[in-house]
Regions:
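Extracellular and organelle-lumenal recognition/adhesion modules and their flexible linkers in secreted
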Residues: 16-164
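Short, compositionally biased P/S/T/A/G/V-rich stretches that sit at domain boundaries
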Residues: 166-177
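Short beta-strand edge segments in extracellular beta-sheet folds
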Residues: 155-156, 255-261
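Structural beta-strand segments of beta-rich domains
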Residues: 78-80, 170, 183-187
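Aromatic (Trp/Tyr) and acidic
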Residues: 176-248, 258-260, 270-343, 347-348, ...
């Protein structure tokens, strides 16, 4: 759920050793990221964290208060200090351990707590190195209920300072997948020299096949690196195992080939089959490791999704909302995010149709059940989501008829890992919103257009739903999803829907030609880009994609704006040490999708002009995603020697359970997020340069999640790159 909002906390101390390891040990305003057992409710009271301890438990760990994700180093001593009181004279246990199986205890000490505040100090040694440490207070076994309060919690120790100890590998950064024979080929080198330095291109046998000297790009603000560029674009011999060397530093290996992205084109799209809800994921298509039973089809222990009620007080009916895609790290399904993802897949289809990139339109391109049905696989996959979106529409005869429910998800967060078929949480429809309704209208109108040649009945159903949603949005133009509705799923709050009105009107006009929609087409593309919350740019992108469907003045204006924004994105690439079309002082949640979405705009500019510079800029954007960045990190699972493998999610949790697989090849990680919006990021990345605020850890949901609208953008770009 890429929109989960979390209080950003800094460690209690960032000075000299001993290093502070606890986040928020003073509880001045909030208890996050501290937690308590379900039977032990806790709250902040007068700057203390207080927990109501129940009676009648047996084991010490039956009632607990704690903080997870504490980094520990094997063989290092740690000192735990805290001040505590209780409403009864009790003896608790305080200690340090492992937050995940096998729940190893580093030390556990008894503390006699009374109503008089007392400060305790305990010391012990960690037996292992981990990012999964846990400070805990255990209360189980109490004969009578009481309240325990704690303040000024501190854990100090370890030799590695917070934010330190990072290994970025070689300073020579390349696209770890490879380069197209006729495309640009550059490497970024971290080197303090202010004058050019020599480089060598070596083949798989170590033979030097090309030499040159770097160009000094200089200080790169986003990464904090001083960067040189090595350009070997005129070397075109195909092969694998190439490396680029600068002195004794050698890059990760890479290839040179005519189509380095053909595999990624497939894998990034097949991701969507793997996140389908309401259907078995068949080993015949994905292999045994990724196969699983259907989730959320009303089979116990599931409590959804064939008859899902509304949250109490919001409606009195239930809907069958089975199907669709699981959104991100959770197993919720969200109209605003899902509609954008479906739009990008359908837009990739329309783009390939208009440019003659026939390989992207194959039936049988993907390993999916629909292969062989004489429909392009990319449309089959988008249909799986669109059919779910249609189910989210409020039925006739009900209040807010024609609007779309904002989302459906669990009542509370499920644990990691949780397989969809094992989810026992109640699931609820959340109230309709204008944003969701317009997203449905846009995606359904596009669906009607692209499905007309293949399934006229389905196309007609989509168009009817789109028109109904449009009228419902006009009747209810300011119904907003609450930002605080973020328990059990992301909020996806949006209180400015002028851009959604514009997008929906554009798609409806493109499909129907009805001029009444023109006056609502006010959205414009800007260098700020687009996202699930900001869809105004999609007006210009759709007009530019389908110029024959729009008035000439609209086409000329959209074309001019798309080219202007694309030029800015190209300048972003050229002005940075690493080729990212996204440039900002701070990196947001899901920054990888800012890269892919901006690259989509550049690719559209190429389609409009066929200028090679735009194509090259898209390919260089792929360089950034696949390792040519400040982290020397490929953000795409399965692609590159240093690829992300531990993305946040409940299904593919190999980091927590070795019996489970890693995320599938072609999964895009969220990428650097300089706001550090989860405890793992806060513990391990304080002081990071914006472009380096990333950690490949399953619990870092703010830097390392996957999401359907991020992978749809990657799939769009991969399809473009595979054709170039």
């Amino acid at each position: 759920m890429p929109v989960l909002l979390v209080v950003s906390l800094a460690p209690a101390a960032q000075a000299d050793a001993p290093y502070e390891r606890v986040l928020n040990g003073t509880f001045d305003t909030t208890k996050a990221p501290w937690w308590s057992s379900g039977n032990t409710p806790s709250r902040v009271d007068a700057g203390r964290l207080c927990a109501d301890v129940p009676a009648g438990t047996v084991n010490p760990w039956d009632s607990m208060l704690g903080e997870n994700d504490i980094p520990l180093e094997a063989g290092r001593p740690y000192t735990l200090r805290f001040t505590a009181t209780a409403t009864a004279d009790v003896t608790i246990r305080a200690g340090l351990g492992l937050a995940v199986a096998p729940s190893t205890t580093m030390f556990s000490k008894s503390a006699a707590v009374t109503s008089t505040p007392k400060t305790f100090t305990f010391t012990g040694t960690s037996s292992l190195s981990t990012l999964r440490g846990q400070v805990n207070f255990q209360f189980g076994g109490a004969a009578k209920a009481y309240t325990f309060c704690v303040d000024d919690v501190s854990l100090t120790g370890g030799a590695i300072p917070p934010g330190g100890g990072k290994d970025y590998g070689s300073p020579v950064r390349v696209n770890q997948v490879g380069y197209a024979t006729t495309g640009p080929k550059e490497a970024s080198i971290v080197d303090d020299s202010t004058t050019p330095v020599p480089w060598e291109l070596r083949d798989s046998a170590g033979k030097v096949v090309k030499k040159g000297r770097t160009q000094v790009r200089g200080d790169d603000a986003a990464s904090g690196d001083h960067v040189h560029i090595a350009d070997f674009g005129d070397y075109r011999k195909e092969g694998t195992g190439y490396t680029l060397a600068v002195g004794t530093a050698v890059s990760e290996p890479f290839g040179i080939s005519r189509d380095p992205y053909d595999g990624l084109r497939r894998d990034s799209l097949e991701y969507f089959y793997l996140v389908r809800s309401g259907t078995p994921i068949d080993a015949a298509y994905v292999g045994d490791a990724y196969a699983r039973p259907a989730g959320h089809l009303g089979v116990a222990p599931n409590k959804g999704d064939t008859s899902v009620p509304c949250l109490p007080g919001t409606c009195d009916y239930s809907l069958d909302v089975s199907g669709g895609w699981y959104d991100a790290g959770d197993q919720g399904k969200y109209v605003v995010n899902g509609a954008l993802a479906a739009w990008q897949l359908m837009d990739s289809y329309e783009r390939s149709l208009s440019t003659g990139d026939w390989a992207n339109l194959k039936d049988g391109l993907l390993k999916v059940p629909e292969a062989g049905n004489r429909v392009p696989d990319v449309l089959d996959e988008s249909r799986w989501e669109v059919e779910f979106l249609l189910k989210m529409q409020v039925p006739a005869g009900q209040p807010l008829t024609g609007m779309a429910h904002h989302k459906i998800h669990d009542l509370a967060w499920t644990a990691l890992p949780t397989q969809p078929q094992a989810d026992a949480q109640p699931r609820y429809l959340h109230a309709p919103s204008t944003a969701a309704t317009l997203n449905l209208a846009a995606a359904a109108a596009q669906c009607a257009r692209v499905w007309q040649p293949y399934d006229r009945a389905f196309a007609a159903k989509c168009l009817a739903a789109a028109k109904t949603a449009w009228q419902a949005a006009l009747a209810h133009p300011a119904v907003y999803a609450p930002a605080e509705d973020s328990v059990g799923g992301g909020a996806y709050a949006d209180t400015d829907v002028a851009d959604e009105f514009s997008w929906a009107a554009t798609e409806l006009y493109a499909t129907t030609g009805d001029r009444t929609y023109l006056k609502s087409m006010t959205g414009r593309i800007t260098a700020d880009g687009f996202s699930w919350r900001d869809t105004g740019a999609l007006t210009d992108l759709t007009i530019a994609r389908l110029p024959w469907r729009f008035p000439l003045d609209r086409v000329l204006g959209a074309r001019q704006r798309v080219l202007g924004v694309a030029d800015q994105y190209v300048r972003n690439i050229d002005s940075q040490g690493y080729p990212n079309p996204f440039k900002a002082a701070a990196y947001p949640w899901g920054s990888s999708s800012s890269t892919t979405n901006n690259a989509l705009v550049i690719a559209t500019a190429y389609d409009l002009t066929h200028r090679p510079g735009y194509r090259d800029a898209v390919l260089e954007s792929m360089d950034y995603l696949l390792g040519r960045n400040g982290l020397n990190q490929s953000f795409v699972t399965g692609y590159g020697e240093r690829a992300s493998t531990n993305e946040h999610g409940r299904i593919w949790a190999h980091q927590l359970d070795p019996k489970l697989p890693t995320p599938p090849p072609g999964s895009l990680a969220g990428g650097p997020n300089s706001a550090l919006q989860d405890p793992v990021a806060q513990q391990n990345l304080p002081g990071c340069a914006p472009a380096k605020c990333y950690i490949d850890d399953i619990f870092s949901y703010s830097t390392n999640e996957t999401a359907v609208n991020w992978n749809s953008s990657l799939a769009w770009i991969a399809a473009f790159a595979a054709g170039k």
